[in-house]
């Protein structure tokens, strides 16, 4: 820009304190494809001593994260299963077919000497109690990330019911966010939780698979933008390529490029990738709604118009470019509500030959039917290119029919939660 006051060129800039997100592939490339490291202290403790300390700590609602990490490491040494094929991720050789591995096979464990931290003990426990002790401490991880108090209370109720299957007179677990957050503040605790979940995700029939009640929260942590892609495909019935064809907003396209960055194994369910944040592979997730707000808002506005409860309850994380996102979402939701994509999945053998002959004739003689359509008329099909050209011819001003559709759907949203996309959509005029 040129300033008319001082007759000098001015370079526009705005302040930014944002951290650059790191992709999981970057972590492994920088660390020579080594496994994530877990540091375990309290080496001098044996399993029975920790069993007594932690069981008492659960009853007293007072746990030390260093005790918990050492205890988990000792328990996880004995959680085993056998690979039915090679397991590799980001160049890390986790195991070969036929190998018996443990959750600790996913990380590099470094056990360190330090001064032992004392703790009160419960002498009435033995190896059989490990099942319920592990259930409690892994559940604490999930509770720590449940910000909604009602949801957290429901989870705690479910845990207390599960404990009755292990003990005749189990301890009653209460809501103690101070305790929960103190555990997750220890990165080695979260790494062990992640390794355990990654292992149990692979071996779903393992005897310890019930622990995923708590560990599941480590999978795809801070990946809400990426996970919303699966959601929009489910709601609309579109494949990913079809959905991408409907992106008409620049910032949404930029976010899609971030999410689809190659080499990060997002399509490999057995990868380290779902544990990018919980395993400490990144300090800022590239797949979060904060890093990709446009795609996240677009998808959940679209879902809200189409009646998705999940979308209506999604948090409103940003208002950047919100007007264009609303228009894009309104168009796609209108088309998907009024232009169904259907096929004749089955035909009788009697008409099979006639069916394919007619189909061939349609392909030869059709295809140009809509090319003569006037640009001032709404497309009759669901071709995103035709819809974009139609909107472009109107300078992207929505026709009244689509505006009315959006207003009707917005009025159907009753009692939306404050701070949600559903609340934003419901207040549209």
UniProtKB/Swiss-Prot annotation:
GO molecular function, one term: RNA binding
Pfam families assigned: Rhabdo_ncap
GO cellular component: helical viral capsid; host cell cytoplasm; ribonucleoprotein complex; viral nucleocapsid
Predominant localisation class: virion
Keywords annotated in UniProt: Capsid protein, Helical capsid protein, Host cytoplasm, Phosphoprotein, Ribonucleoprotein, RNA-binding, Viral nucleoprotein, Virion
Protein name, entry field: Nucleoprotein
General function of this protein: Encapsidates the genome, protecting it from nucleases. If expressed without protein P it binds non-specifically RNA and therefore can bind it's own mRNA. Interaction with protein P abolishes any non-specific RNA binding, and prevents phosphorylation. The soluble N-P complex encapsidates specifically the genomic RNA, with protein N protecting the genome like a pearl necklace. The encapsidated genomic RNA is termed the nucleocapsid (NC) and serves as template for viral transcription and replication. Protein N binds protein P in the NC through a different interaction, and can be phosphorylated.
Region listing for Disordered, in residue ranges: 355-378
Family statement: Belongs to the ephemerovirus nucleocapsid protein family.
Domain of life: Viruses
Quaternary assembly: Homomultimerizes to form the nucleocapsid. Binds to viral genomic RNA.
UniProt-listed InterPro entries: Rhabdo_ncapsid, Rhabdovirus_ncapsid_C, Rhabdovirus_ncapsid_N, Rhabdovirus_nucleoprotein-like
Biased composition regions of type Acidic residues, renumbered to the chain: 359-376
Organism: Adelaide River virus (ARV)
Subcellular location: Virion; Host cytoplasm
